[in-house]
């Protein structure tokens, strides 16, 4: 029989083993222009880098979420069972997403726990996730700037291990560089459907145009969209649907800006 906290220690040890492997990943040290080449795409794509980022973030923010669970009044036995469950990863990912969107997760998570009716709940993680989604849907988040890497990857924040923070920063830089490089490539070559809607504009590579195109390029690279449709099919998965809506908003902005440009109005 394991003593209290041993389940959590085992989870942390396993996570650190995974992180060690990720940190040895040589492809992460490649520069943006090198990662654009086809033979390096498997390791340097936003799909791969975002997956690494999320794995590191889950471990890096672990203590933060534990603190909020305790603040809400959950006892250690319940917390141990929660973090050992399969749904804990989904919950922590949702907390990071809401935090990056500007919601006050530090205040809201303890509040939804204190709302009660948690006794004998079979799936506490899913219930807390549902409550967080419900309460955050009722109001607009903080006016502070949303913290999204390349417009689609929620940024991890809060106090964390310095080594993990450095690993996150490195991957944030790589994701951003790749997304921007892909956006420039698309705008320069007109190789994607997203690029074609803005190429007629003289300002296609400046300001908001590049930012919006970067979001679309990041989405395509993360989810392997290669067809003529800028965003591909509407996804069924909840997590991808969130990213799809972000990319769709950027695409709409691109088209609206193009339609309003002098070049678009010219006969």
What kind of feature is each model-predicted range?
Residues 3-267:
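Alpha-helical structural signal
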């Amino acid at each position: 029989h394991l003593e209290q906290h041993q389940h959590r220690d085992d989870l942390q040890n396993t996570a650190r083993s995974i992180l060690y492997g990720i940190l040895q990943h040589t492809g992460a040290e490649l520069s943006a222009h090198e990662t654009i080449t086809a033979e390096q795409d498997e390791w340097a794509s936003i799909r791969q880098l975002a997956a690494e980022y999320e794995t590191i973030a889950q471990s890096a923010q672990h203590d933060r979420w534990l603190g909020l669970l305790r603040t809400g009044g959950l006892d250690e036995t319940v917390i141990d069972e929660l973090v050992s469950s399969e749904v804990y990863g989904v919950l922590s990912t949702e907390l990071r997403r809401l935090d990056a969107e500007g919601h006050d997760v530090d205040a809201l998570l303890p509040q939804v726990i204190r709302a009660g009716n948690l006794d004998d709940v079979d799936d506490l993680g899913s219930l807390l996730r549902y409550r967080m989604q419900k309460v955050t849907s009722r109001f607009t988040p903080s006016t502070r700037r949303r913290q999204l890497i390349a417009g689609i990857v929620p940024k991890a924040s809060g106090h964390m291990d310095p080594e993990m923070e450095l690993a996150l920063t490195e991957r944030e830089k790589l994701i951003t560089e790749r997304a921007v490089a892909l956006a420039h490539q698309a705008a320069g070559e007109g190789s994607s459907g997203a690029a074609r809607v803005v190429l007629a504009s003289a300002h296609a590579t400046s300001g908001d145009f590049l930012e919006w195109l970067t979001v679309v390029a990041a989405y395509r690279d993360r989810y392997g969209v290669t067809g003529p449709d800028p965003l591909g099919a509407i996804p069924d998965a909840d997590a991808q649907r969130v990213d799809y809506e972000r990319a769709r908003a950027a695409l709409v902005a691109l088209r609206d800006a193009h339609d309003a440009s002098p070049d678009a109005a010219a006969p």
